[in-house]
């Protein structure tokens, strides 16, 4: 391909890979100037008919899916006994490389990425297309930082009411049901993979990881992972629901769309045709292409029968979408539409009015087939004879096919070699040379090497290999600046001129890999080149950075729609303190019943904090004594989560305190403050349980899954306070309204530095037993 300067209407330019014959080339349309990437399939005529059919089936899927968050297939051209696939140009490269450079992302950026992935994936699921190989290596960034899903080599059509059988994907991202070899729901498995990506974006590492593949698979099947304590409760809850081992109880796409962590985003309204009437007449050419997708090329009669039936079937939907591409509007119809547009524009101009594109489309009633111009649309430049048919007639030869991912299913023509066909070792690849587009270093490359077992799996650790730094030509993809590339930039277009296209790949430019950063104001500044690399994870939250117009930075810590920040809290355990700000607005009523699987451990919200700054305005921040202020000692604090709403939880706490007061435990001075929604009381020195005196406060806060009671020690014995808070937790558990997330945490939590008496030896045990007998 190095001697080819053009393919059809596309002028070839820089090589995006290693420079070999299988490397992708940056291309520009001769007349429209559109940028694209041309990927060759060398030896196409030497493939068997079944191998060609599988590759063509993937191309049909790519052509069917038209969504802003899915990589766009532009054209397929045959020239010089080769097949050239023209796909969308993605200046941002892979999300994987961006994660290697940046490490972890803020919750705001993570939510934006996750929402875009889910939007594209939901559109595929509506077409009954399951991706089955979602991972950061298969997600790409455009010039504006938007994510697009690519690599549909393992995608499959899942008929309604049926399950998939083939085990495929990468073990780090594959769902437990795929690893265990069971029949599975492809949509639920894709949601699991999105949960792994969600975790990696937030933390910079994978939730399930091990050098031993057997241990890794066991971890995935058990679903046990360490939940980071420095993320919001909403993010934790969504992670638990997405990484549910039981696919039948795993959160669905509809529930994810309504989850508070993502409720601030507006769901795009992209319609999909649902057809019940029989297709008449049936085009044999379209059926031939659909038979590649449904893998029934040998016997297409069942496909004809379904198209002629009276039921709304997925075959009819895909037939309708494919017919729009194979049979675009005639030139006469296009000319009539253009005449109507000119007439409308002339009338509007005479009246001193201006019409936008949406008004024009509504006036002439022209359906929009694609979100942006593509070469096979009616208004595009006609293709030459070499690309008149998007697919070729299968040719049976005796050639070899050395890039199949198993014995029956060859890999994607656009797919990276890191993907495996089943749960076998597949580690994230190292940094690849070139611009890391979705088309370089494919499985067609002759110099492909298996993934190394030492490939990095922690995205927070930068790669310090000098050879890797010299081989990478992509510029640093900092989230604040590098998504500003414009395809219409004169400097870019000038470099892509046909006369300036180099015949080979020039010397690689020196790449500066990202290092651990230091935070200065609202910018992230890299250390000098000579500084030593620090492998420790460091997180910085740029509070004033505006990443998306759809997100309100002032309200995003609690991502509800129209949420407002009105409260803050500081929590601490005897092992250290943790500062945490959270919005305490009322949550949707539908989330009172959301539960988290009991077998997972809830990480403590009280891990040590890197800041000592006080959070003003907290409704339950007590006064500190002179010694506490002198030694910067914070009071003990503990949270108990309940499924009740805040008002009901307040009533239950007051009822327990008053009952204890009647039993003679020594409870006194019970005061309810309706302004701060807190209850204060104390245990007197003279009490029937010989407890040390203590003064405490209980603040009730609304959460999206119910409410929480925050117990704060104001003065007195921390041991008595610990018994008191634990007793409330046990009472809530006995009454059945302790939140499952909190229940699993208390059951699995390790011993704390402060000694805690057992439940049976607790001073409150006798009264709890008496209350159980009475109830």
UniProtKB/Swiss-Prot annotation:
Catalytic function, reaction form: L-seryl-[protein] + ATP = O-phospho-L-seryl-[protein] + ADP + H(+); L-threonyl-[protein] + ATP = O-phospho-L-threonyl-[protein] + ADP + H(+)
PTM comment: Autophosphorylated.
Domain of life: Eukaryota
Keyword Transferase: yes
Disordered as annotated region, ranges: 549-620
PROSITE patterns: PROTEIN_KINASE_DOM (PS50011), PROTEIN_KINASE_ST (PS00108)
A Pfam family of this chain: Pkinase
One BP term from GO: mitotic G2 cell size control checkpoint signaling
Keyword Cell cycle assigned: yes
Molecular-function GO terms, alphabetical: ATP binding; protein serine kinase activity; protein serine/threonine kinase activity; protein-membrane adaptor activity; signaling adaptor activity
Database matches in CDD domains: Kcc4p_like_C, STKc_BRSK1_2
Catalytic EC class: transferase
Protein role: Acts as a mitotic inducer. In G2 it negatively regulates wee1, a mitotic inhibitor. Also has a role in cytokinesis where it required for proper septum formation.
Family: Belongs to the protein kinase superfamily. CAMK Ser/Thr protein kinase family. NIM1 subfamily.
Known partners and oligomeric status: Interacts with blt1 and mid1.
Protein name, as recorded: Mitosis inducer protein kinase cdr2
Source species: Schizosaccharomyces pombe (strain 972 / ATCC 24843) (Fission yeast)
């Amino acid at each position: 391909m190095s001697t080819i300067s053009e393919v059809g209407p596309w002028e070839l330019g820089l090589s995006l890979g290693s420079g070999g014959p299988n490397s992708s080339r940056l291309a520009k349309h001769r007349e429209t100037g559109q940028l694209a990437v041309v990927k060759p399939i060398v030896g196409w005529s030497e493939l068997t008919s079944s191998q060609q059919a599988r590759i063509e089936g993937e191309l049909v899927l790519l052509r069917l899916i038209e969504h802003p968050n899915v990589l766009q297939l532009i054209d397929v051209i045959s020239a010089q006994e080769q097949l050239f696939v023209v796909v969308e140009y993605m200046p941002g490269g892979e999300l994987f490389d961006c994660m290697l450079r940046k490490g972890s992302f803020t919750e705001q950026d993570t939510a934006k990425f996750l929402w875009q992935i889910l939007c594209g994936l939901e559109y595929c699921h509506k077409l009954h297309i399951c991706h089955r190989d979602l991972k950061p290596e298969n997600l790409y960034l455009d010039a504006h930082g938007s994510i697009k899903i690519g690599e549909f080599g393992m995608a499959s059509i899942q008929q309604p009411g049926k399950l998939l059988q083939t085990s495929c994907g990468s073990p780090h991202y594959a769902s437990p049901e795929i690893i265990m070899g069971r029949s599975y729901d492809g949509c639920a498995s894709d949601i699991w993979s999105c949960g792994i990506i969600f975790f990696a974006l937030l933390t910079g590492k994978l939730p399930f990881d091990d050098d031993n593949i057997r241990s890794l698979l066991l971890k995935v099947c058990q679903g046990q992972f360490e939940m980071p304590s420095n993320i919001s409760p909403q993010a934790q809850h969504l992670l638990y629901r997405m990484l549910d081992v039981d696919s039948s109880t795993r959160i669905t796409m509809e529930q994810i769309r309504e989850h508070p962590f993502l409720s601030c985003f507006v769901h795009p309204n992209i319609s999909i045709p649902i057809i019940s009437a029989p297709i008449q007449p049936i085009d044999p050419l379209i059926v031939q292409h659909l038979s590649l997708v449904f893998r029934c090329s040998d016997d297409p009669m069942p496909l004809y029968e379904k198209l002629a039936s009276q039921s709304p079937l997925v075959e009819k939907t895909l037939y309708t979408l494919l017919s729009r591409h194979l049979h675009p509007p005639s030139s006469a119809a296009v000319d009539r539409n253009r005449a109507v547009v000119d007439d409308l524009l002339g009338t509007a101009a005479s009246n001193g009015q201006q019409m936008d594109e949406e008004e024009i489309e509504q006036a002439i009633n022209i359906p929009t087939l694609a979100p942006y111009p593509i070469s096979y649309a009616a208004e595009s430049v006609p293709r030459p004879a070499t690309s008149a048919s998007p697919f070729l007639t299968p040719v049976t030869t005796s050639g070899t096919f050395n890039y199949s991912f198993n014995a029956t299913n060859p890999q994607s023509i656009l797919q990276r070699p890191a993907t495996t066909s089943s749960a076998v070792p597949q580690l994230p690849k190292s940094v690849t040379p070139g611009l890391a587009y979705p088309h370089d270093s494919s499985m067609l490359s002759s110099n492909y090497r298996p993934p190394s077992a030492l490939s990095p799996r922690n995205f927070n650790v930068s790669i310090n290999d000098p050879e890797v730094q010299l081989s990478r030509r992509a510029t640093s993809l900092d989230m604040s600046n590098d998504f500003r590339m414009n395809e219409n930039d004169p400097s870019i277009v000038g470099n892509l001129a046909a006369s300036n296209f180099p015949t080979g790949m020039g010397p690689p430019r020196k790449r500066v890999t990202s290092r651990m950063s230091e935070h200065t104001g609202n910018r992230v500044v890299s250390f000098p080149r000579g500084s030593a690399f620090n492998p420790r994870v460091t997180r910085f939250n740029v509070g004033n950075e505006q990443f998306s117009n759809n997100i309100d930075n002032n309200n995003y810590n609690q991502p509800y729609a129209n949420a407002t920040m009105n409260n803050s809290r500081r929590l601490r355990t005897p092992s250290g303190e943790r500062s945490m700000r959270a919005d305490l607005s009322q949550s949707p009523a539908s989330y009172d019943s959301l539960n988290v699987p009991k077998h997972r451990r809830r990480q403590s919200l009280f891990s040590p904090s890197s800041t000592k700054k006080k959070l003003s305005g907290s409704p339950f921040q007590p006064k500190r004594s002179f010694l506490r202020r002198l030694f910067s000692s914070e009071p003990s604090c503990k949270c108990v989560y309940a499924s009740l709403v805040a008002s009901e939880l307040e009533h239950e706490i007051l009822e327990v305190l008053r009952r204890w007061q009647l039993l003679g435990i020594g409870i006194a001075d019970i005061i309810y403050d309706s302004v701060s929604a807190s209850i204060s009381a104390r245990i007197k020195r003279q009490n029937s349980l010989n407890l040390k005196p203590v003064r405490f406060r209980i603040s009730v806060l609304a959460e999206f899954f119910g409410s929480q009671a925050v117990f704060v020690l104001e003065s007195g014995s921390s041991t008595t306070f610990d018994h008191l808070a634990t007793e409330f937790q046990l009472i809530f558990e006995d009454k059945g309204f302790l939140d499952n997330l909190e229940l699993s945490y208390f059951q699995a939590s390790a011993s704390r530095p402060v000694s805690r008496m057992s439940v049976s030896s607790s001073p409150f045990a006798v009264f709890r037993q008496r209350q159980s007998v009475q109830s």
